[in-house]
């Protein structure tokens, strides 16, 4: 079983990218579990066709310790196993701590013991690489990390920060970076810039996802692009990304860069000039 965590700054399209990629892998015959590690609890919405998924933390708050796996796990598109860790009540507690609680509970309930599982995907909020959000890295819950990024300064800054987290836990947790996924914002020279960033970080840009309105249309209809419009070229982009992840063999401990180098990249490609 391959355990993959998808990180990236908030609003970058991480959950959308994860779910569409998972749909591509499911279509290719793989059995997958998706664990949402974001307090917004939107990591499985498209796979469940908008069905409200009761989060692990909400279930624990309401049911106490008497929780069974079926309470926190729903089957979605193509038999995908879907679960959301959720977050604390607003203004109370730590969302990162909630991720730790959720993953531990899933382990206790035997969620990972399904022998048919080929992949587990963790969809993780990535602006803050605090202890809880770093848990999939820190405790070896995930072995491969992919970072969703775009040609915008803060998305690149977050990607670099996440790489620092990977370096910190690479030896103890055994995790490696599998590559950057560029979710395009149609920034000038974006593809070249992210390829250059990947090179500086010692990794690869595993795929460039073009900006396309069908993604939003599919989301409004609570579906992945692959389910909503399977013949569309954008569906093929996600299939291609799924195939590249499935066949990927380039895993590295990244080499994070200084902020000055990041700014130089932006100047070189004309964004900050």
Swiss-Prot record:
UniProt-recorded Gene Ontology molecular function terms: 4 iron, 4 sulfur cluster binding; ATP binding; metal ion binding; nitrogenase activity
EC number: 1.18.6.1
The entry's keywords: 4Fe-4S, ADP-ribosylation, ATP-binding, Iron, Iron-sulfur, Metal-binding, Nitrogen fixation, Nucleotide-binding, Oxidoreductase
Broadest EC class assigned to this enzyme: oxidoreductase
Catalytic activity: N2 + 8 reduced [2Fe-2S]-[ferredoxin] + 16 ATP + 16 H2O = H2 + 8 oxidized [2Fe-2S]-[ferredoxin] + 2 NH4(+) + 16 ADP + 16 phosphate + 6 H(+)
Record's cofactor remark: Binds 1 [4Fe-4S] cluster per dimer.
Modified sites of kind ADP-ribosylarginine: 97
Any one biological process term the GO annotation gives: nitrogen fixation
Source superkingdom: Bacteria
UniProt modification remark: The reversible ADP-ribosylation of Arg-97 inactivates the nitrogenase reductase and regulates nitrogenase activity.
Listed cofactors: [4Fe-4S] cluster
CDD domains tied to this protein: NifH
Entry binding sites for [4Fe-4S] cluster: 94, 130
Binding sites annotated in the UniProt record for ATP: 8-15
Function of the molecule: The key enzymatic reactions in nitrogen fixation are catalyzed by the nitrogenase complex, which has 2 components: the iron protein and the molybdenum-iron protein.
Quaternary structure (record): Homodimer.
Family statement drawn from the similarity comment of this UniProt entry: Belongs to the NifH/BchL/ChlL family.
HAMAP family cross-referenced by the UniProt entry: NifH (MF_00533)
Protein name from the UniProt record: Nitrogenase iron protein
Species whose genome carries this gene: Desulforapulum autotrophicum (strain ATCC 43914 / DSM 3382 / VKM B-1955 / HRM2) (Desulfobacterium autotrophicum)
């Amino acid at each position: 079983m391959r355990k993959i965590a998808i990180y990236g700054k908030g609003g970058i399209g991480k959950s959308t990218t994860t779910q569409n990629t998972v749909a591509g892998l499911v279509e290719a015959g793989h059995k997958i579990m998706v664990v949402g590690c974001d307090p917004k609890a939107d990591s499985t919405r498209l796979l469940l066709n908008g069905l409200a998924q009761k989060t692990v933390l909400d279930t624990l708050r309401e049911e106490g310790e008497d929780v069974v796996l079926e309470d926190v796990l729903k089957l979605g598109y193509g038999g995908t196993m879907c679960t959301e860790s959720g977050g604390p009540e607003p203004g109370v507690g730590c969302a990162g701590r909630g991720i730790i609680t959720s993953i531990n509970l899933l382990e206790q309930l035997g969620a990972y013991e399904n022998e048919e599982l080929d992949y587990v995907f963790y969809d993780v909020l990535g602006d803050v690489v605090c202890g809880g959000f770093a848990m999939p890295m820190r405790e070896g819950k995930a072995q491969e990390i992919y970072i969703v990024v775009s040609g915008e300064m803060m998305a690149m800054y977050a990607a670099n920060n996440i790489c620092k987290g990977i370096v910190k836990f690479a030896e103890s947790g055994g995790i490696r970076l599998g590559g950057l996924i560029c979710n395009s914002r149609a920034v000038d020279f974006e593809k070249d810039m992210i390829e250059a960033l990947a090179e500086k970080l010692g990794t690869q840009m595993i795929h460039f996802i073009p900006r396309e309105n069908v993604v939003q249309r599919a989301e409004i209809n609570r579906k992945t692009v692959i389910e909503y419009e399977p013949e569309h070229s954008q569906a093929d982009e996600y299939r291609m990304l799924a195939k590249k992840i499935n066949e990927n063999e380039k895993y590295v401990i990244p080499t994070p860069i200084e902020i000055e180098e990041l700014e130089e990249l932006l100047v070189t490609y004309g964004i900050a000039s």
